[in-house]
UniProtKB/Swiss-Prot annotation:
ATP binds at G15, A16, S17, A18, S19, G20, K21, S22. One of its GO terms (molecular function) is uridine kinase activity. Homotetramer. Its EC number is 2.7.1.48. Belongs to the uridine kinase family. It comes from the Bacteria. It catalyses: uridine + ATP = UMP + ADP + H(+); cytidine + ATP = CMP + ADP + H(+). The lineage of its organism: Bacteria, Pseudomonadati, Pseudomonadota, Gammaproteobacteria, Enterobacterales. Pathway: Pyrimidine metabolism; CTP biosynthesis via salvage pathway; CTP from cytidine: step 1/3; Pyrimidine metabolism; UMP biosynthesis via salvage pathway; UMP from uridine: step 1/1. This is Uridine kinase.
Length: 213
């Protein structure tokens, strides 16, 4: 954990795919933004830092194990977190779930008082853990995560149910057990039942609000 005197406070939210990380992050962002203003709080998804695969064919891209730490460009993410803490803006990559690679365009992200960083593999990398002021692990049963993932990937990402199930059995579940679940030990706060745990969200809001004082 980093010293809280840093200009930009980084809060990490990790957990299984479809565990409710994004819902918690978006709820915290929306409700805190109403209190402090958009210029003081932001959200960065770890998914933006999937490695560029534009040099690979589509057939090769779909074979990538997206639940393994090697799929992430954590070195670039680390550089960006450190830049934000120095007060510098970053060019956030844009990742396409349809094309399975980064887009050419980027999004400028200005430093904020608080940045909420959310993703499945955040706590697996000691370098990233060292940049977090505190971390959260969203602990949701895998069967619930699977049902949510099927609904999300079919409806929002253009996937077939068969491909989602095959990926879950081949990589998602094994990688969760090998990398993601063990990283729970590094979390400062564990949130059960995902993004609908209102008590947990209120506790997190109170904690984060301290950084705006």
């Amino acid at each position: 954990m980093t010293d809280q005197s840093h200009q930009c406070v980084i809060i990490g939210i990790a957990g299984a795919s479809a565990s409710g990380k994004s819902l918690i992050a978006s709820t915290l962002y929306r409700e805190l933004r109403e209190q402090v203003g958009d210029e003081h709080i932001g959200v960065i998804p770890e998914d933006c830092y999937y490695k560029d695969q534009s040099h690979l064919s589509m057939e090769e891209r779909v074979k990538t194990n997206y639940d393994h730490p090697s799929a992430m460009d954590h070195s670039l993410l680390l550089e960006h977190l450190q830049a934000l803490k120095r007060g510098s803006a970053i060019d956030l990559p844009v990742y396409s779930y349809v094309e399975h690679t980064r887009m050419k365009e980027t999004v400028t992200v200005e430093p904020k008082k608080v940045i909420i960083l959310e993703g499945i593999l955040l706590l697996t990398d000691a370098r990233l853990r060292d940049e977090l002021n505190f971390s959260i692990f969203v602990d949701t049963p895998l069967d619930i995560c699977l049902m949510r993932r099927i609904k999300r990937d079919v409806n929002e990402r253009g996937r077939s149910m068969d491909s989602v199930m095959a990926q879950y059995q081949k990589t998602v579940r094994p990688m969760f057990l090998q990398f993601i679940e063990p990283s729970k030990q590094y979390a400062d706060i564990i949130v059960p039942r995902g993004g609908k745990n209102r008590i947990a969200i209120d506790i997190l809001k109170a904690k984060i609000s301290q950084f705006f004082e």
